[in-house]
Structures are given as structure tokens and as C-alpha cells.
């Protein structure tokens, strides 16, 4: 099953170089880091790019489903693609790192347009995304976050309703989540965790 890494606002695929290398070193063979651009356009258009990357990787590998690891805004974009763009049933697990699932107050501190404005706390976009359940598309969801994340405010916005697990890895900043071995250990646990008995 391919593991696809989706960066956050203003980033690119290089943000995941450390995690991509470490996962490969730990034996995960098919790890792909993707980019979407430009960050200031509508989040729905960015989610379409995420959707297209996943579809392309599934087609090239012949896999039926992918695992997706997302940082920051990559989480809401992936959830949108699962809910609205046809990824439902094609993703096994979604693991988010410091994702503002219900928006962040930081995004309201400056004039913003496009996806940045859509990431404001309790914005119409994030409220619409949560309607009918925050974990769409039949995927298993895990949210990893930190109590000291300086971009995801309040911290509770990183706690995803309906997720299989919400995991606090304390004392890490927003970008430090990408480079922490403690986070990497949790990501791997989520990737390996057996499906819960019904």
C-alpha cells in the first residue's frame, strides 16, 4: 500500500523529506511526497490537486488503496477530497499532523484570501467539511497533534471528532511535528495498527 505525504499551507513536497527518508529506512517501500500550488487559491481547487496525485499514484502502483499522512492544511484538503471529489473507498488510513480540522484563530489575525481565509476558525469551509461527520470516505482516521503547536489554535481544533485515535505528542511546535522521531513512531504505529474488532 503506497504511503502518500501531503504538506501544509505554503509548503511543498520537500517538507516531508525527513519523514519520507525515515519511513523508507524503516522498510516502507512506496512512499511518495506530493505538492499542490499555489497556496492562496481556493482550498477546493487544492484538494482537487491532492485527489489527482492520489489517483495517479494508485494507477502507477496498481494498488487498490493508499495511506495518506498530512501536515497542517493537508488534513482538511484530504478530508475534502474524500468527501467530495471521489477518493472515497480509495484511502485506507489518513494520519494528520497538526491539522486545523475546525480552522485556526491564527488565520484570522491577518488579511487573507483563498485557502488561508478558509482555514480560519469555524469558517464556512471547515463547518461544511464537518457536516455529516468529520471522517469521510470510509478511511480510518488518526490525528497526531501537540499541545504547544503555535499555529493550530485552539489546540482542540486538531482533535478530530470520530477519529480512531487523537494522539498528543507534547512540547513540539507546528513544523517540528515533521522532524520528530516521537511523531514518526506514532505515524508508524498508526500505519501498522490492526483494524479494531467490531
Task: Label each residue range with its predicted role.
Residues 1:
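Alpha/beta-hydrolase fold active-site loops
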Residues 138-145, 165-167:
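Catalytic His-Asp charge-relay segment
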Residues 43, 172-181:
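Catalytic histidine-centered segment of alpha/beta-hydrolase-like enzymes
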Residues 147-152, 174-175:
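Acidic catalytic loop of the alpha/beta-hydrolase fold
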Residues 4-14, 22-137, 144:
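Serine-dependent carboxylesterase/thioesterase catalytic core
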Residues 192-198:
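Generic C-terminal helix-cap and adjacent flexible tail
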Residues 15, 151-156:
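Conserved alpha/beta-hydrolase "acid-adjacent" motif
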Residues 178-191:
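Post-His helix in hydrolase/transferase enzymes
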Amino acid at each position: 500500500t503506497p504511503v502518500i505525504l501531503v504538506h501544509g499551507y505554503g509548503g511543498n513536497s520537500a517538507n516531508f523529506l525527513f519523514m519520507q527518508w525515515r519511513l523508507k529506512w524503516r522498510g516502507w517501500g512506496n512512499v511518495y511526497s506530493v505538492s499542490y500550488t499555489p497556496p492562496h487559491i481556493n482550498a477546493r481547487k487544492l484538494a482537487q490537486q491532492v485527489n489527482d496525485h492520489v489517483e495517479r499514484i494508485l494507477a502507477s502502483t496498481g494498488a487498490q488503496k493508499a495511506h495518506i499522512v498530512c501536515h497542517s492544511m493537508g488534513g482538511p484538503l484530504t478530508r475534502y477530497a474524500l468527501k467530495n471529489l471521489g477518493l472515497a473507498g480509495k484511502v485506507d488510513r489518513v494520519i494528520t499532523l497538526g491539522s486545523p480540522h475546525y480552522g485556526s484563530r491564527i488565520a484570522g489575525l491577518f488579511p487573507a484570501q483563498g485557502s488561508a481565509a478558509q482555514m480560519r476558525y469555524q469558517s464556512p469551509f471547515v463547518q461544511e467539511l464537518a457536516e455529516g461527520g468529520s471522517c469521510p470516505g470510509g478511511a480510518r482516521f488518526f490525528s497526531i497533534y501537540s499541545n504547544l503547536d503555535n499555529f493550530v489554535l485552539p489546540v482542540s481544533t486538531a482533535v478530530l471528532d470520530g477519529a480512531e485515535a487523537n494522539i498528543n505528542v507534547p512540547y513540539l511546535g507546528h513544523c517540528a511535528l515533521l522532524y520528530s522521531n516521537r511523531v514518526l513512531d506514532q505515524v508508524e504505529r498508526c500505519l501498522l495498527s490492526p483494524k479494531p474488532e467490531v
